[in-house]
């Protein structure tokens, strides 16, 4: 017999379902993601730290899980909410069922609830704090109290919590259907030395940089600009990550130094927001954020529309852009800023996820633009 579970939102709404993960209590900001596939990549994306993820697609878990699709070394989401967990996981790459995967990492999950109703609540009221309780003691009052006690992500610096503890080299390229994950490339195949700040970096971002000839030195979030400059990089990459960008003063100040030095800079997600803050713009907390793999974004410079992968709850405020920042991309869902480019420095950033994983690859040429800036700077 399945164990029961409940999800309680801070507004008092209660959802009862069945447990699909570990027993226990988990608290976080409840968000919804509209991706139809890629649940393992979503769960292991460090950007979901302190968030409970609701997947709007009704059937989740069909293909199981495997060690190659992880975007980090562990699950970072606080919990998982789905409509239906299939009885059987069927895929030639399957190594472990989704339920067993959650249990193995002590992550709570709940299924058999009305995820459409939950999503409508989050859209209308905004992202809410919530608490999942799974197991034998389903105490609604306790869950509600814990949801209300959660401080929320505004003002929360999570990048330094999920970052690597020590610097390391990354030389592995992208997975292919024919051969799986490749061996690390030789330095002779990687002409560009890029220092990548790990604010919660996804592995597929690193792989796509390696595919384009980058030898990566991945450094902790609080690494000083002086330490990075001592490595003599050809460019600096600012990764994705969780939480509020404003408290990341260490990263903002370091980025200011790189801008002054004229180093090529590319930022994604949190890295995009950090570049904006370092350039004098401001950021805002969004009502319910963008989380999904089907978000249309307009490229203002090429006048084309891209379908993109998105995962962010904060955004750079276009109204605060200084004269040396040019808006390059906007969301066609709500008009929010999606990309910027410094007019006076070789620096640019994108709010969405051009590496996808999961999602489309329409924005992948942004990685090529970074390489072009590095080549021009090195010439």
Curated annotation (Swiss-Prot):
SUPFAM superfamilies: Carbamoyl phosphate synthetase, small subunit N-terminal domain, Class I glutamine amidotransferase-like. Its EC number is 6.3.5.5. It catalyses: hydrogencarbonate + L-glutamine + 2 ATP + H2O = carbamoyl phosphate + L-glutamate + 2 ADP + phosphate + 2 H(+). Residues 1-189 are annotated as: CPSase. L-glutamine binds at residues 47, 241, 243, 270, 273, 311, 313-314. GO terms for biological process: 'de novo' pyrimidine nucleobase biosynthetic process; 'de novo' UMP biosynthetic process; glutamine metabolic process; L-arginine biosynthetic process. It comes from the Bacteria. The keyword Transferase does not apply. Pathway: Amino-acid biosynthesis; L-arginine biosynthesis; carbamoyl phosphate from bicarbonate: step 1/1; Pyrimidine metabolism; UMP biosynthesis via de novo pathway; (S)-dihydroorotate from bicarbonate: step 1/3. Keywords: Amino-acid biosynthesis, Arginine biosynthesis, ATP-binding, Glutamine amidotransferase, Ligase, Nucleotide-binding, Pyrimidine biosynthesis. The active site is at residues 269, 353, 355. GO terms for molecular function: ATP binding; carbamoyl-phosphate synthase (glutamine-hydrolyzing) activity; glutaminase activity. PROSITE patterns: GATASE_TYPE_1. It is an enzyme of class 6 (ligase). Small subunit of the glutamine-dependent carbamoyl phosphate synthetase (CPSase). CPSase catalyzes the formation of carbamoyl phosphate from the ammonia moiety of glutamine, carbonate, and phosphate donated by ATP, constituting the first step of 2 biosynthetic pathways, one leading to arginine and/or urea and the other to pyrimidine nucleotides. The small subunit (glutamine amidotransferase) binds and cleaves glutamine to supply the large subunit with the substrate ammonia. SMART domains: CPSase_sm_chain (SM01097). Residues 193-379 form the Glutamine amidotransferase type-1 domain. Composed of two chains; the small (or glutamine) chain promotes the hydrolysis of glutamine to ammonia, which is used by the large (or ammonia) chain to synthesize carbamoyl phosphate. Tetramer of heterodimers (alpha,beta)4. Pfam families: CPSase_sm_chain, GATase. Belongs to the CarA family. This is Carbamoyl phosphate synthase small chain.
